[in-house]
């Protein structure tokens, strides 16, 4: 199967998971990116079971609304049973690198309040050690250079994310992203805490302190369900 076919496979599997495990009338947390889009497309078939969704980005909001799925502000919701999102990498503990789609801050906020985090990914995203995929760090623009120096001191190579026209990529929150290459992340929880503590960092795209509870992993043999210890 192609990577796109695997993404559709896990998107459909996630919709089945939600149908089987989340009661009718609930609100679903939804991530951002191509794999999350496959989940949204599959969720549309059972949308009448649920009140709607909490979105992690402007792009996800637009896709949800295109399917007629009501989108709630997180501030309107008392509880969120499940959050479904993709990952750029996921290790054996359920820690992830996320943020390739630029929505890492809002993704982390929604994930933090969900009772269950369901990661959906194809098998290429499973790794032994995080860090081959560049680590996104969302920064306040005035702190970009200072944060870049600190990331370089860790052994990484920070690169400002830019659009096709060469202008800096701007997040939904009005910030910029440094993509850090060359890091071998042996202790993602500690690195997440350290980088998040730097003035000027909005958030780092490490999801280790609140990692996935389970992963629906698309493989040539079908969908594998991987479960992780509590974070």
From Swiss-Prot:
Active site (catalytic residues): 107 (proton acceptor)
Protein name: Ribose-5-phosphate isomerase A
Associated pathway: Carbohydrate degradation; pentose phosphate pathway; D-ribose 5-phosphate from D-ribulose 5-phosphate (non-oxidative stage): step 1/1
Single Gene Ontology BP annotation: D-ribose metabolic process
Gene name, Swiss-Prot/TrEMBL: rpiA
GO cellular component annotations of the record: cytosol
Coiled-coil region: none
Enzyme Commission code: 5.3.1.6
Family of this protein: Belongs to the ribose 5-phosphate isomerase family.
Highest taxon listed in the record's lineage: Bacteria
One of the record's GO molecular function terms: ribose-5-phosphate isomerase activity
Catalytic activity: aldehydo-D-ribose 5-phosphate = D-ribulose 5-phosphate
SUPFAM superfamilies: D-ribose-5-phosphate isomerase (RpiA), lid domain (SSF75445), NagB/RpiA/CoA transferase-like (SSF100950)
Keyword terms, alphabetized: Isomerase
Pfam family, one: Rib_5-P_isom_A
